[in-house]
Amino acid sequence: MVWALTPVDTVRGAQRCYIFAAGTYKVGRKDCDVIVQTDTSISRVHAEIVVEKMVAWDPQSGAPANPSYVRVVDRSKYGTFFNKVQGTQGSRLHKDEDAMLADGDTVTFGTGSATFRLSFVPIVVFFHGKKSGRISPSLQAVMTSIGAYATRKWSDECTHVLVDESCSLTPELLDAVLAKKQIVLGDWFKVMAEKNIHTAMPSSTQYIPKLTLDGMEIQVVEIKLIESCLAGYTFILGSSEKYKFGDKLHALLESTGAKYLHVDEFCANSQDSGAGENDKDILLVPAKSPLEFSKISGLFPLSKITDVKLFAAILSGHLEATAIEPPAYIVASSNSTDETIVVDSDVEIDTATSDHTVAASKSEHHIEHISDDKKEVVAISEEDAVNLVEAKTSINLHSYQEKDEIVKPMEEDVKVIEKTATMRGFKVEGEDIPVMTKVPKDETLDSRDETCHVIYTQNLVVKSILQSARAESIETGGINFKRFRKRGAVSGNSFKDLIPYSREPYRESDYKRGTVIDFMREEKKRRQMEAIAEDLFNNAKPKKKAAAGSSIHTMLTGRR
């Protein structure tokens, strides 16, 4: 066990000290192991705390070892008092006198209020290793030097858990986490033994091991970081026996600040209050049977996490988003694509269109669509059935002829594809025929919510309810990919845009129009005018200089 000197009153310059090894430790005002700066009655070296040896404490004995092997020796002028109670002097030690101290005794240095209490801090180590394994002799010697007691039996009196690196997670380790006992490596005890005396217990952050669970490596953190690491989350659980370490699961969730509900309770609440819309409601799925709750429709909107990943999140102190499986949204099975809106546009006259208008009623017909592996019955109206026959007629005009009246085609009917169109595929006499039926403009907005099939084919039949278009067969030739090109469209990088100053960009020469001859004549005239101006300017300079010189000479000589 480790000894601690704790100030009874909060006085200036007094701190708690931990003694980790046997030895002699000085108490005084300056340059001492225990510094006390309360009043002038404290000597420079006032007393000494002598620890003859460190004694281990066996929790089964119920009391610390006796004797404690801790003595106090007075080295001061004003004396040292032990077990001094308020209102009494206690036992005073004169210079060079000593006294044996026990757990809970108080020591007062000087005549002031510098009172410290001696108490033992037990270190009971639960050794979690292989059943046949033992603590190494070197580590055992270190633990003995600091008074640590090692045991292989877990109990609530254990203060620390000693494990090897990459040790497997067991129920005993989970019990230690629930009891807020730190899991450490053997190097932590070596660091403690090297300090001898210190104002705080050494940190175990760098000496926390990694555990393994079903092949997953878990980096354990300090116990204080595990607390409330899952606060705000609600886990939906099944029966405890379905999960790994199921008997520890509820207690672990409570210790981390999380809530939990049973599957039946959650389903009952979801029907009444619409539960399950919260992102922090997570379904806990057993790793050994991931499809355990796949048949319960009320759990479909929930995110999922396996019990193994949940234990890893608890021991690591945080729940990563990658460990959570997002909910599986149900998408209705349909053979239709998204709604397609085709804006009115100009189409070239050579676009292959055909339309034959016939009378139709609203009675329903059924046409079988036989695929390679299944048969699908599609219900269509008689109008669609007539459109189907007309589509077949437009593809093979020589094979099938309609007896109904054929309206004279018009070129404006090429623009028959407007706001919304519906494509249906049918199989008639062994040949697939796509039919596109135009929806009138005055259709209600609800029709836009319906799904549509828009499939391109060179034999596409475009039907207009109001007008019909001229039909041209293209079966003899290949696919005309320019059929949808706008007439008169000009590229953005045209010659006209790049060279805007050219009158006729495709004319190689302008000699025929006389523009070059006129330009040369004007240029020659301009140069002649510049030469004349230059001569006049140069001839005017000497005259000005001569006139200026004669006038100065006249002024100097006084002649006129």
Curated annotation (Swiss-Prot):
UniProt-listed GO biological process terms: cellular response to ionizing radiation; DNA damage response; double-strand break repair via homologous recombination; mitotic G2 DNA damage checkpoint signaling; mitotic recombination; reciprocal meiotic recombination
Motif Nuclear localization signal: where in chain: 511-518
Key words, A-Z: Cell cycle, Chromosome, DNA damage, DNA repair, Nucleus
SUPFAM superfamilies named among the record's database cross-references: BRCT domain, SMAD/FHA domain
Residue span(s) of domain BRCT: 115-190
Pfam families: FHA
Domain FHA: 25-87
GO molecular function, one term: damaged DNA binding
GO annotation, cellular component aspect: chromosome; Mre11 complex
Keyword Nucleus (UniProt): yes
Location of this chain's protein in the cell: Nucleus; Chromosome
CDD domains, per the entry: FHA_NBN
Function: Component of the MRN complex, which plays a central role in double-strand break (DSB) repair, DNA recombination, maintenance of telomere integrity and meiosis. The MRN complex is involved in the repair of DNA double-strand breaks (DSBs) via homologous recombination (HR), an error-free mechanism which primarily occurs during S and G2 phases. The complex (1) mediates the end resection of damaged DNA, which generates proper single-stranded DNA, a key initial steps in HR, and is (2) required for the recruitment of other repair factors and efficient activation of ATM and ATR upon DNA damage.
Note on domains (UniProt): The FHA and BRCT domains are likely to have a crucial role for both binding to histone H2AFX and for relocalization of MRE11/RAD50 complex to the vicinity of DNA damage.
Protein family according to the UniProt entry: Belongs to the Nibrin family.
Assembly and oligomerization: Component of the MRN complex composed of two heterodimers RAD50 and MRE11 associated with a single NBS1.
Protein name: Nibrin homolog
Biological source species: Oryza sativa subsp. indica (Rice)
Gene: NBS1
